[in-house]
């Protein structure tokens, strides 16, 4: 049985969002094809995702100096403990499904905060004399992203930073398989929007059977 983290970074649901509608079709297809797998939904707009702030750095610093966890302030304890929960949960999974829109050439900031929470030396990567090495070498990841315009080809391709960044992070973590399910052009060509959405949903259903 595999454990899948279904990580959504969108304030809207599938009735409004193309990425969420595509993701819903994918995850339903996946569950049907893999009924014994555990799928854990992490809605980043509803979860407590601490930012790496002064409290976190202070707490980490105290722990690294040998101080006990009980010496941390209440704020430091809460944030450090939550970050540990998130990173442990991430490492425990076998597959990751990230869902986001393309906003300002990237993704919503809550997804960056989540990535920061799981990018932990000794858990998702380690330092060696040759440089950092990823530790998640037996995992796989998928990014479902909707883009109102066209960014796969042409001059705008260099502007898209969200999907490319997630690919970089996956590689940094050692994840050998990173796929993209991209939905694009529905704002650029409104007359084709419903067909674009329908095509994406069909692709999602097919991928859900094999992911």
From Swiss-Prot:
Q: Name one GO molecular function term.
A: electron transfer activity
Might you give the EC number(s) for this enzyme? 1.6.5.-, 1.7.1.17
Q: Which gene encodes it?
A: azoR
Q: What's this protein's name?
A: FMN-dependent NADH:quinone oxidoreductase
Q: Which cysteine-cysteine pairs are annotated as disulfide bonds in the entry? A: none
Q: Which InterPro entries match?
A: Flavodoxin_fold, Flavoprotein-like_sf, FMN-dep_NADH:Q_OxRdtase_AzoR1, NADH:quinone_OxRdtase_FMN_depd
Provenance organism: Bacillus pumilus (strain SAFR-032)
Q: Which residues bind FMN?
A: 17-19
Query: According to its UniProt record, which protein family does this protein belong to?
Result: Belongs to the azoreductase type 1 family.
NCBIfam families linked to this entry: PRK13556.1 (NF010075)
Cofactor section: FMN
The top EC class is oxidoreductase
Q: Which UniProt keywords apply?
A: Flavoprotein, FMN, NAD, Oxidoreductase
The note describing how and how many cofactors are bound reads: Binds 1 FMN per subunit.
Q: Which domain of life is it from?
A: Bacteria
Question: Quaternary state and partners of this protein?
Answer: Homodimer.
Q: Say what the protein does.
A: Quinone reductase that provides resistance to thiol-specific stress caused by electrophilic quinones.
Catalytic activity, as annotated:
2 a quinone + NADH + H(+) = 2 a 1,4-benzosemiquinone + NAD(+); N,N-dimethyl-1,4-phenylenediamine + anthranilate + 2 NAD(+) = 2-(4-dimethylaminophenyl)diazenylbenzoate + 2 NADH + 2 H(+)
